[in-house]
Amino acid sequence: TTPLKPGMILSNEPGYYKQGAYGIRIENLVVVQPHPKPEGGDRELLGFRTLTLCPIDRRLIVAGLLTADELAWLDAYHARVAAELRPLVGDAALWLEQACRPIA
């Protein structure tokens, strides 16, 4: 194994599979970066910053299966996607706004 170092890029692929029912996997690329040491901490920490931003397809989301915290995370993620990509997408801005509208 190789220890993580700032600047390394890896894939974050959380997933959940309910046997015989459904499964989901969401994947983004993240970059390793220094993270502030907590007060009283005795060593430097690393964290991750998401590099790839893309709306999660709403047609695949069953909001009733998500907790309030999960819905809040999804809406915050979509708000970030819209804010960061809006200046870059030109004619696709309307599509982006629709894809990133709040679920909760």
What is each model feature region?
Residues 1-104:
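Charged, cofactor-coupling segments
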